[in-house]
Design a protein with these regions (language model features):
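Beta-rich globular "head" domains
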Residues: 1-44, 93-98
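Surface-exposed loop/edge segments in extracytoplasmic proteins
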Residues: 2, 46-57
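A short local loop/turn or secondary-structure capping micro-motif enriched for an aromatic residue
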Residues: 32-34, 61-65, 87-88
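Extracellular/periplasmic carbohydrate-active domains that bind, remodel
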Residues: 54, 58, 91-94
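Beta-sandwich interaction modules
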Residues: 57-75
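Noncatalytic modules at the cell exterior or secretory-pathway interfaces
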Residues: 71-85
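Exposed low-complexity, polar/acidic, P/S/T/G-rich flexible segments that act as propeptides
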Residues: 85-101
Length: 101
């Protein structure tokens, strides 16, 4: 299976149904002036408002402990949701890479 790219704005959710583990890499994530929540495999992380996260030069590194690379087992779900509205998530670019490449 080839890699999959999720890009857009608003709440985002991905359920791994590949039959194998996947690596989820957040290249870009921008949150507006309200909090958002990232959830995966029983973990919940608050995503600070007004910040940009991701694997790029000058990405925010010290504002909060938001992971930008996550491993998901088959059947597990990853999501980012705005605290007050889906518009809290201004933009994202996420790549999902299957374990087998």
């Amino acid at each position: 299976m080839a890699a999959q790219v999720l890009s857009g704005s608003g709440n985002v959710s991905y359920t791994n149904s590949t039959g194998q583990n996947v690596r989820l890499v957040i290249n870009y994530l921008k949150i507006d002036q309200a909090l958002a929540t990232m959830s995966f495999q029983g973990v919940t992380v608050s995503v600070t408002q007004g910040k940009v996260y991701g694997k790029f030069r000058d990405a925010v590194a010290s504002s909060s402990n938001v992971p930008v690379e996550i491993a998901l087992a088959n059947g597990e779900t990853f999501s980012i949701t705005g605290s007050t509205a889906s518009t809290n998530v201004e933009g994202y670019n996420i790549i999902i890479i299957p374990e087998a490449g």
